[in-house]
Amino acid sequence: SRAAAAWTYRNAEDFGGNPERISVSGHSAGGHLTGMLLSTDWGKNYGLPPNLIKGFLPVSGLFDLKPFPFSWLQPKLLLTSEQVLRNSPVFLKPVYTPHVMVAVGADESHEFQRQSKNYTIFLQKHGVPAEYLSMPGKNHFNIIHDFLGDGGPLCKKIIEWK
């Protein structure tokens, strides 16, 4: 995802985009990747502006991987405690302070709600203007439907970004 963001910045004008108005969003594991981008030192690692991405909207993301070694996925993932910390956005200090909206469905599991709320608080403690959005009537599977048209609540929030 980091290489994709760097590529987008470098090539945005070639396809009519504005490299100074990049925002990212991701759902579930994509929400995790969105969080990882926020801890990227774009200048040091890619020679790009430090505030490369202007806005972040992780949706129902996985921000704290500490529970994973105790889950049914561990035999496949084989996560070490070092890997958990290195790959959990909730433990990675943001490099800069763009606007962030962390969205989660109000009907999602307690764990998704906990992780989204804790990540929002973590960002706020580090000076990031982060907003927590609990979406009524939404769960892990239907929350993403808001991106199907410009009338959904999440799309409206994105459109309001300046």
Where on the chain are the PLM-derived regions?
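Alpha/beta-hydrolase superfamily serine-hydrolase fold, recognizing
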Residues: 1-162
